[in-house]
Design a protein with these regions (language model features):
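Regulatory N- and C-terminal appendages and interdomain linkers associated
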Residues: 1-59
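N-terminal positively charged helical leader segments and presequences
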Residues: 112, 122-151
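A structural preference for short, hydrophobic beta-strand core positions in alpha/beta folds
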Residues: 115, 149-152, 204, 244, ...
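Small/aliphatic-rich secondary-structure junction motif
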Residues: 70-127, 197, 209-276, 284, ...
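Residue-level detector of anion-binding/catalytic polar loops
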Residues: 25, 112, 147, 170, ...
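Charged docking surfaces used in two-component/phosphorelay signaling
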Residues: 152-159, 277-282
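Class I S-adenosyl-L-methionine
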Residues: 20, 134-138, 142, 232, ...
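Gly/Ser-rich helix-loop-strand patches that form or flank binding pockets
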Residues: 57-72, 101, 160-208, 289-331
Length: 331
């Protein structure tokens, strides 16, 4: 039977092998989660005692509701929840907007930014286009005086973003192609797949924002409650202003989820503006954002079972199509 010391030494070796193989700086806790994803629960059970002693709990993909919060919203040694931010770099204006947003957050949180440019086929690192992307990344990152590094990898975009997100705390990406409002389009949507399976919170960026006034879209669901917890953290640690909105089916509805949100925020002594309106949820949320001057949205991830979401759509899909401000997606 291996001792905790033996297991720890093996983990350190595995962490170094991963870092050498992929060229990424990987935290021990992220290496453990990588083992879970690769080899399943049986191997990870052997780590349980050591993990409880040394690292936050983590689990294999797909993440259960609340798993990220239990790992990141408890006090961490670094004193931050987004210590490392992954941002997809596509070499287009949309990708540079996503980088700008990641840099804004990194300055608030004192985070490191890791850009990832994914190439589907074979590539030459000395190619003119790649050199231009590297140069542009350095030019845009340098004025912020934070740790920023660009990685180049070959593979399928969705899979690589998911895998590398596990080694970071937040995934930031450009919002170029939101799911269209048709079942067949939703079924084929890579963005939908990314949001459903990503092990970390995601920030979809149509255009950058200073992120000073959040609109929390709250319906009382488990994932919306996770968004509520994150919103409370941002108020307390970033000093943002918070507005909470709920969409009701009709004006006679007896149950209003805002009561639960108000009770939680009051327990944390957090001030927020709360209101509800009747209508299609995505329309109510976008209208509230515009009227209240909010500069980003916080929302829970997909709430339906996959088949139901494909057939009937979701509030999140509507927001991804309609919002001109960043959307922070929690699960």
């Amino acid at each position: 039977e291996r001792t905790p010391t033996d297991l720890y030494l093996w983990l350190v070796k595995y962490q170094k092998e991963l870092s050498h193989q992929f060229g990424w700086e990987i935290k021990p806790s992220s290496a453990i989660e990588g083992l879970a994803a690769a080899y399943g629960n049986r191997l990870i059970h052997r780590w349980k005692r050591l993990k409880n002693q040394l690292f936050p709990m983590s689990s294999s993909q797909p993440p259960p509701v609340g798993d990220w919060r239990k790992t990141h919203l408890v006090p961490r040694k670094e004193g931050q929840i987004f210590s490392s931010i992954l941002v997809g770099i596509n070499g287009k204006d949309s990708g540079w907007r996503a980088l700008e947003q990641a840099l804004i957050i990194a300055q608030i949180e004192n985070s490191a930014v890791r850009g990832l440019h994914i190439i589907k086929g074979e590539f030459d690192p000395s190619d003119d286009q790649i050199r231009e992307i590297r140069a542009e990344f350095r030019k845009r990152s340098a004025p912020h005086k934070i740790s920023a590094k660009l990685y180049l990898e070959q593979g399928e975009v969705l899979n690589l973003l998911n895998e590398r997100a596990r080694w970071n705390d937040l995934l930031v990406f450009s919002l170029e192609h939101p799911p269209k409002d048709r079942p067949a389009a939703r079924l084929r949507s890579n963005l939908r797949g990314l949001i459903q399976t990503c092990p970390r919170p995601l920030l979809a960026v149509p255009s950058p924002s200073p992120m000073r006034h959040a609109l929390l879209a709250y319906d009382g669901s488990p994932k919306a409650t996770e968004a509520l917890y994150l919103a409370a953290y941002l108020v307390e640690h970033w000093g943002i202003k918070l507005t909470v909105v709920t969409a009701l089916e009709d004006s006679t509805s007896r149950h209003n989820p805002l009561h639960k949100a108000q009770e939680y925020l009051a327990s944390r002594e957090i001030e927020a503006s709360l209101f509800s309106d009747v209508g299609l949820p995505s329309d109510v949320i976008i209208s509230a954002m515009n009227k209240r001057g909010c500069d980003f949205i916080i929302v829970g991830g997909y709430g339906y079972q996959p088949v139901m979401e494909v057939l009937f759509g979701s509030t999140l899909n509507g927001l991804l199509r309609k919002s001109e401000k960043p959307i922070l997606i929690c699960h």
